[in-house]
């Protein structure tokens, strides 16, 4: 399988990489959170831009991105606007969503963007091409905070992301039962063994799905999300506990 290298981090080799999400509503909080996060043990910094209040001011958004880049220059920076329909804090038009991601790509400050699969096929394809032309990687994502579809549908979505040339397909689903967690893990394994030619990220959310955040190396998920302070999604555990478990499983 092809790995993805961002800065010096090789995603898709070794233990799953730890992603943490920074959620701050203004530049002052971005700065203070960044200083706190700098001391934590993680691999990729995700900036959840949908928590940022001054979204209409692109200069303000990029000033915040610059603070993150300068505070943690060695960490890959993932720029994520999570739409309201997929569990985010704000709703914006598709046009504004694409423009925001293009501005991030143009800035030269971010290493990766998160691009939601169901934004619209043409817009997704164009944005992937634009990102790649500027040496920015794309995590293509889908989130369902209500349910877990059948394994075939999970695999179909991941394969669609791969067909759109996402560098890393990602899916996060809400289990209604423990068997839903098994469905997600089985789909992950089948995708990884039969179809994936690049790293994928999968997770089952909430307390029921916590096990899926720990066993990625076994079933084929290349990264997992941990919490430095506040969790960005239900079921995340602290980065220190997460690193301990991932290391134990990797060395076993």
Swiss-Prot record:
Q: Where is the active site?
A: 143 (proton donor/acceptor), 170 (schiff-base intermediate with substrate)
Work out whether the entry's keyword set contains Mitochondrion.
no
- Gene3D superfamilies given in the database record: Aldolase class I (3.20.20.70)
Give the EC number.
4.2.1.10
**What GO biological process terms are annotated to this protein in UniProt?**
3,4-dihydroxybenzoate biosynthetic process; amino acid biosynthetic process; aromatic amino acid family biosynthetic process; chorismate biosynthetic process
Superkingdom to which the source organism belongs = Bacteria
Entry keyword set: Amino-acid biosynthesis, Aromatic amino acid biosynthesis, Lyase, Schiff base
What the entry lists under InterPro entries is as follows: 3-dehydroquinate_DH_AS, Aldolase_TIM, DHquinase_I, Type-I_3-dehydroquinase
What does the entry list as the binding residues for 3-dehydroquinate? Answer: 21, 46-48, 82, 213, 232, 236
Keyword rRNA-binding part of the UniProt annotation: no
Instruction: Cite the GO molecular-function annotations of the record.
Output: 3-dehydroquinate dehydratase activity
Spell out the reaction equation it catalyses: 3-dehydroquinate = 3-dehydroshikimate + H2O
Q: In which pathway does it act?
A: Metabolic intermediate biosynthesis; chorismate biosynthesis; chorismate from D-erythrose 4-phosphate and phosphoenolpyruvate: step 3/7
What is the enzyme's main class? lyase
Q: Which CDD domains match?
A: DHQase_I
Query: Its family?
Result: Belongs to the type-I 3-dehydroquinase family.
Q: What does this protein do?
A: Involved in the third step of the chorismate pathway, which leads to the biosynthesis of aromatic amino acids. Catalyzes the cis-dehydration of 3-dehydroquinate (DHQ) and introduces the first double bond of the aromatic ring to yield 3-dehydroshikimate.
Subunit info here reads:
Homodimer.
PANTHER family to which the protein is assigned, alphabetical: 3-DEHYDROQUINATE DEHYDRATASE
* Name the UniProt record assigns to this protein: 3-dehydroquinate dehydratase
Which gene name belongs to this protein?
aroD
């Amino acid at each position: 399988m092809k790995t993805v290298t961002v800065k010096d981090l090789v995603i898709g080799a070794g233990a799953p990489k730890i992603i943490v999400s920074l959620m701050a509503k203004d530049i002052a909080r971005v700065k203070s959170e960044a200083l706190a996060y700098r001391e934590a043990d993680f691999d990729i910094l995700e900036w959840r831009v949908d928590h940022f209040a001054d979204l209409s001011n692109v200069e303000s958004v990029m000033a915040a991105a610059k603070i993150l880049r300068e505070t943690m220059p060695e960490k890959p920076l993932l720029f994520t606007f999570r739409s309201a329909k997929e569990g985010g804090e704000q709703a914006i038009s598709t046009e504004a969503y694409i423009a925001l991601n293009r501005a991030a790509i143009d800035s030269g400050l971010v290493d990766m963007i998160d691009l939601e699969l169901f934004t619209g096929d043409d817009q997704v394809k164009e944005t992937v091409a634009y990102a790649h032309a500027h040496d920015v990687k794309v995590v293509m994502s889908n989130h369902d905070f209500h349910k877990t579809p059948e394994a075939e549908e999970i695999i179909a979505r991941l394969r669609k992301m791969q067909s759109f040339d996402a560098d890393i397909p990602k899916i996060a689903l809400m289990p209604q039962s423990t068997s839903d967690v098994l469905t997600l893990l089985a789909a992950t394994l089948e995708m990884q063994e039969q179809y994936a030619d690049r790293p994928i990220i999968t997770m089952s959310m909430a307390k029921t799905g916590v096990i899926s955040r720990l066993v990625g190396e076994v079933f084929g998920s290349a990264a997992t999300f941990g919490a430095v302070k506040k969790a960005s999604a239900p079921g995340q555990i602290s980065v220190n506990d997460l690193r301990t478990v991932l290391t134990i499983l990797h060395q076993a």
